[in-house]
């Protein structure tokens, strides 16, 4: 079969609420995730029978069995009992690594979609979702994209029919990293006394999010975007001067709708009603962002993953 390629879009968290601890040790979450048009690109070409290989435009990214692209390919072969299937995969990396933007998860989800097509496996959406959920907490969302309520570890999805599609000014200091396990551990240490423990309590919070002002704004049922909640930001920002500085910079120019950290960070974003407003803010902030070591991108939120 001739070569194929698919885009692997980034995401941001418009809401990240840590509800409590699950029996399996993971945190129970209530989130709103949003796909952006910033994307990696994954291509596949033929290879000798049984051979899987991955190359990447960014030499910092591991291309061995620890990479979710390779894990996804191997999971597909196991699921179908087809060890002879082969692929030469190449990734063009545009999403910053380790940034809280689900770049790795999106790459893994895209590998599932791409290889399902390339190998003509004809797996159903449900089968792909189950494989995605096994690969990682954000992979199931990245498989579908758009704007979604995400519950459980992030694998339980409810699509939101949104009217608002804000522009996004995204910033990240490439010299700063945040360990996701560390962030969740700190959250448990600092906020754990308020954790919920019963399924009834979890469901009450899920329902509150479904009926929240944020959802009303996304559906254009109210004009004012409320402050965005990220429980990990509450604990990470006080420990990270770069995150604090970035949030302050984003809030200082262009009258953003709201500013927040994405996921466990360290990526930060500001929302604007349209691209011209985001571009004006980027222009105004560019000197200060450069002075403080931040890379920056203007992105658009999208209604679907646009594979």
From Swiss-Prot:
Its EC number is 2.7.1.148. The keyword Ligase does not apply. The keyword Cell division does not apply. Keywords: ATP-binding, Isoprene biosynthesis, Kinase, Nucleotide-binding, Transferase. The active site is at 11, 138. Coiled coil: none annotated. Pathway: Isoprenoid biosynthesis; isopentenyl diphosphate biosynthesis via DXP pathway; isopentenyl diphosphate from 1-deoxy-D-xylulose 5-phosphate: step 3/6. ATP binds at residues 96-106. InterPro entries: GHMP_kinase_C_dom, GHMP_kinase_C_sf, GHMP_kinase_N_dom, IspE, Ribosomal_Su5_D2-typ_SF, Ribsml_uS5_D2-typ_fold_subgr. GO terms for biological process: isopentenyl diphosphate biosynthetic process, methylerythritol 4-phosphate pathway; terpenoid biosynthetic process. It catalyses: 4-CDP-2-C-methyl-D-erythritol + ATP = 4-CDP-2-C-methyl-D-erythritol 2-phosphate + ADP + H(+). One of its GO terms (molecular function) is 4-(cytidine 5'-diphospho)-2-C-methyl-D-erythritol kinase activity. Belongs to the GHMP kinase family. IspE subfamily. NCBIfam families: ispE (TIGR00154). Catalyzes the phosphorylation of the position 2 hydroxy group of 4-diphosphocytidyl-2C-methyl-D-erythritol. This is 4-diphosphocytidyl-2-C-methyl-D-erythritol kinase. It comes from Synechococcus sp. (strain RCC307). The lineage of its organism: Bacteria, Bacillati, Cyanobacteriota, Cyanophyceae, Synechococcales. The gene is ispE.
